[in-house]
């Protein structure tokens, strides 16, 4: 059983995560976050810790951001959008149990202080911005690192605030090259 309580958006997400792992879960019920839900999350955070696993879409990122402010030592897990999408829907409920397990294997803490390890130049030099398919490459490298997707500025912030090391960065770029560039 996972020690921390996993925070997701809805009941369908709870059902999907339960297919993947043995864990206690709390659903936010969307962005509105009722006070009773916040109290439940706070109790879990203080007693066992929480893992935020929201949908890889705009509303999910807003919920994650809001929870990150309230619970700064929460852990974060990201299922890539490509693994949580159907034709017309994006959400954890669409992810395979294996995708959920992979995301939970790569949980990260969001450090309030930036490491300043990475700079926009690193993204340029790695073709993660300003290049053909930079968007797709950022999504793939973000999935490998377990930090999710973001535009170039958001991605750079995640690299620095999730404590990614140069070794992890180089390993992720190499893995990307092995998987995608030799097709």
Give the location of each predicted region.
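Acidic beta-strand-to-loop metal/phosphate-binding motif
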Residues: 7-9, 47-59, 78
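Short, basic, helix/turn surface patches
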Residues: 50-62, 102-110
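Short, ordered loop/turn segments at secondary-structure junctions
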Residues: 11-12, 29-31, 55-57, 79-84
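Hydrophobic anchor at the start of a short beta-strand
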Residues: 24-25, 50, 74-75
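Phosphate- and divalent-cation-binding pockets in alpha/beta enzyme and binding domains
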Residues: 16, 62-66
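Long, charge-dense
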Residues: 66-113
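Acidic, glycine-rich catalytic loops of TOPRIM or P-loop NTPase phosphate-binding modules used
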Residues: 4, 11-47
């Amino acid at each position: 059983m996972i020690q921390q309580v996993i925070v997701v958006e809805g009941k369908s997400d709870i059902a999907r995560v339960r297919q993947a792992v043995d864990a206690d879960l709390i659903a936010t019920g969307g962005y509105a976050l009722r006070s009773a839900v916040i109290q439940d999350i706070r109790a879990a955070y203080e007693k066992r810790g929480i893992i935020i696993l929201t949908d890889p879409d705009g509303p999910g990122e807003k919920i994650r951001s809001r929870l990150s402010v309230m619970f700064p030592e929460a852990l974060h897990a990201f299922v890539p959008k490509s693994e949580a999408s159907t034709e017309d829907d994006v959400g954890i409920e669409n992810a395979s149990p294996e995708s959920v397990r992979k995301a939970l294997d790569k949980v990260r803490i969001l450090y309030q202080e930036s490491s300043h390890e990475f700079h926009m130049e690193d993204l340029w030099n790695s073709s993660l911005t300003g290049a053909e398919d930079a968007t797709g490459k950022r999504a793939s490298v973000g999935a490998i690192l377990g930090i999710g997707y973001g535009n170039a500025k958001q991605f750079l912030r995640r690299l620095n605030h999730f404590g990614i090391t140069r070794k992890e960065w180089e390993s992720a770029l190499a893995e990307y090259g092995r998987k995608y560039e030799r097709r």
